[in-house]
Amino acid sequence: MGRGACVPSAASGAGDRARQLGAVLGALCLFPALVLLAWPGTPANGAGARVAQGDAAPQTSGVLASGSLGPPHPPVPRRRRYTLTPARLRWEHFNLTYKILSFPRNLLSPSETRRGLAAAFRMWSDVSPFSFREVAPEQPSDLRIGFYPVNHTDCLVSPLHHCFDGPTGELAHAFFPPHGGIHFDDSEYWVLGRTRYSWKKGVWLTDLVHVAAHEIGHALGLMHSQHGRALMHLNATLRGWKALSQDELWGLHRLYGCLDRLFVCASWARRGFCDTRRRLMKRLCPSSCDFCYEFPFPTVAATPPPPRTKTKLVPEGRNVTFRCGQKILHKKGKVYWYKDQEPLEFSYPGYLALGEAHLSIIANAINEGTYTCVVRRRQRVLSTYSWRIRVRS
């Protein structure tokens, strides 16, 4: 992909601008399954190999202890995210095409790569109205897949699309609809089979099907799931869950609807049949849809913006950075960021870059809204700042 795939260009035409509006939304990353394989009696407190945490906490680094017989220790599980994107980004059609722009240089042949990706796509097409078809690289497609080195596409010039980090770090990232980009780190050792540590090669062998299925979920509009056994869980590779769970189905159906055979279940649920006609709903409505299920999104205490909110009218495509009072941070306060009262916990490449005391976004119609930073020390609010962003066409 050429430059500008993630960040709108001021010189783009009207058609490109509409496409780039969706392209600016971020990729989510999947990290390696650093499964602990310690021998009996081996201490479990050795330092792990470098694990990049590109969309979460600061990076950790270290080297394997000289006396250790186990591979790198697993990263500490991190906090969970919403299941759907903030703007509920989705595809407007179900017959999606994909093309493979480059293949891995380690271990897998092109034919094996195609077979692994096709298996990952089948995991989603078997439980959804989507169908996926590969097309030639020179043809237009909805999804574009590639195996890339550290410096790929526009990662060096884009503040919101990060580069890869080499082996045993970030495995892949995918962009929300309608961008369609799915990038795999070509420094990894991809295989068809379970993720495992190779003592002979001294590297991790990573299951392509597992990682690809996770990234396809992001490309369809799903974020990380809260369910511990979901394929879309933040640490799915670490935990080893490979099958799609009911949680992914509910997330997918919230975005695209669930096509029940009689096309009546949704209206029955609205009429109260979940309480008054439970047997009827159970007998005629697909259990995978579960129209009576209320998805348990995480909730946080509402944080209204301060009385004085700065309004900024920004040209479309401009990079906007908010800074949350450096002086107040010296009082050992912790910064919390919100958009329209929803918490922002992680950076999303191509969407926003989140630092301790600053937040950067690309101005576009979807990123319009009110951004608030709250500095707290324990339960006490030390300071608040708020900005309202409006895009000038």
UniProtKB/Swiss-Prot annotation:
Superkingdom in the source lineage: Eukaryota
Disulfide links within the chain: 258-292, 265-285, 274-289, 324-373
Name of the molecule in the record: Matrix metalloproteinase-23
Primary localisation category: membrane
Comment, domains: The ShKT domain associates with, and blocks several potassium channels in the nanomolar to low micromolar range. The relative affinity is Kv1.6 > Kv1.3 > Kv1.1 = Kv3.2 > Kv1.4.
Propeptide: 1-81
Site (Cleavage): 81-82
Topological domains, Cytoplasmic: 1-20
Residue ranges occupied by any ShKT domain in the UniProt entry: 258-292
Posttranslational mods: N-glycosylated.
Similarity annotation: Belongs to the peptidase M10A family.
Enzyme class name: hydrolase
Entry keywords, A to Z: Cleavage on pair of basic residues, Disulfide bond, Endoplasmic reticulum, Glycoprotein, Hydrolase, Immunoglobulin domain, Membrane, Metal-binding, Metalloprotease, Protease, Signal-anchor, Transmembrane, Transmembrane helix, Zinc, Zymogen
Topology within the bilayer: Single-pass type II membrane protein
Cofactor section: Zn(2+)
Function: Protease. May regulate the surface expression of some potassium channels by retaining them in the endoplasmic reticulum.
Sequence positions that bind Zn(2+): 214, 218, 224
Pfam family, one: ShK
Glycosylation, residue list: 95, 151, 235, 319
Protein localization: Membrane; Endoplasmic reticulum membrane
Residue numbers annotated as active site: 215
GO cellular component, one term: extracellular matrix
